[in-house]
């Protein structure tokens, strides 16, 4: 998404930056891992295809992508990459009033580097992207789809972030969860102001 092309968000446990060409080779290496592809529902692409995908994501108004970096701004940025966090943006019926259509952000987070797991980095990255999208894109409905064997993600979204189950697909063995509106307002609406600094990404 062009809207975040110059946005850098420095939080307490991680830094979020736009997905740039310099990140593609490392991202492609992550996607060579079959388990990561399975859990993220991703297809294996060639490196050239990955570069084309990065260009597409950059210009796609329906996809918001940040690369997750560890808290270290020295040296090469690519050396500090831990994963990514995304929003897939669409219009769907409101769960509060199905006759009304609302803009919905479907969340996806991946901490691909083992050194970045179990430290609350994925949780913070999700909180940051939701708070940023709520404030800048006026998105007020957020959901996530998680396969029923992805225990870490189920724990993250249910227990730590407070998402509530609204559906289950037996065909895909996949839960759908949604962030309650009251929790969005009480916990996420002021998260950036209290926990992060917005900078210009150069």
UniProtKB/Swiss-Prot annotation:
Enzyme class: transferase
SUPFAM superfamilies: Acyl-CoA N-acyltransferases (Nat)
Lipid metabolism in keyword set: no
GO MF: N-acetyltransferase activity
Keyword Acyltransferase among record annotations: yes
InterPro entries assigned to the protein according to its UniProt record, in alphabetical order: Acyl_CoA_acyltransferase, GNAT_dom, NAT9-like
Keyword line: Acyltransferase, Transferase
UniProt cross-references to Pfam families, sorted A to Z: Acetyltransf_3
Residue intervals of the N-acetyltransferase domain: 34-184
Protein EC: 2.3.1.-
Family: Belongs to the acetyltransferase family. GNAT subfamily.
Protein name stated in the entry: N-acetyltransferase 9-like protein
């Amino acid at each position: 998404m062009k809207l975040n092309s110059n946005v850098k968000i420095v939080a307490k446990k991680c830094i979020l930056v736009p997905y740039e060409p310099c990140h593609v080779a490392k991202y492609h290496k992550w996607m060579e891992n079959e388990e990561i592809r399975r859990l993220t529902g991703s297809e294996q692409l060639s490196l050239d295809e990955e570069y084309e995908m990065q260009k597409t994501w950059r210009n796609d108004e329906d996809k918001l992508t940040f690369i997750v970096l560890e808290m270290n701004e020295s040296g090469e940025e690519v050396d500090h990459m831990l994963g990514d966090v995304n929003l897939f943006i669409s219009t769907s019926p409101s769960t509060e009033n199905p006759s009304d259509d609302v803009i919905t952000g479907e969340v996806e987070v991946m901490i691909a580097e083992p050194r970045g797991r179990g430290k609350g980095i994925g949780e913070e990255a999700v909180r940051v992207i939701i708070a940023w999208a709520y404030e800048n894109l006026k998105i007020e409905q957020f959901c996530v789809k998680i396969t029923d064997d992805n225990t870490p993600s189920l724990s993250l979204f249910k227990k730590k972030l407070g998402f509530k189950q609204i559906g289950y697909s037996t065909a895909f063995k996949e839960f759908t969860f949604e962030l309650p509106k009251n929790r969005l307002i009480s916990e996420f609406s002021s998260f950036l102001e209290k926990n992060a600094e917005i900078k210009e990404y150069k």
